[in-house]
């Protein structure tokens, strides 16, 4: 899948790199207009900063909420990073499907969302990097 960036996203990426000095892999707006930055492995600490200082600085300068996610070449670990801070019992799967086992019904509801919107959003993010069919929650 070919990824295209508009001027606005390029500006956000530049600002992110200038403030955090972390190597950025990708940047996009999700369905909820949340600006999501995907950083390379082992760069998450540098991107967040002490006590979330850099995140707060970025949110203030960009005037919007942001989410920073660490990329992982392992599909299941990347999925865990995407759904963080929600806790799960396990994330399992094969090469085409991912099955997330929620701890309780509240977490399950937050993972799925109304009309499975949250789940489809997570699925679209994972599909940007891995060839999967679907994500399911048990």
Predicted features and spans:
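RNA-contacting regions in translation and RNA-metabolism proteins
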Residues: 1-138
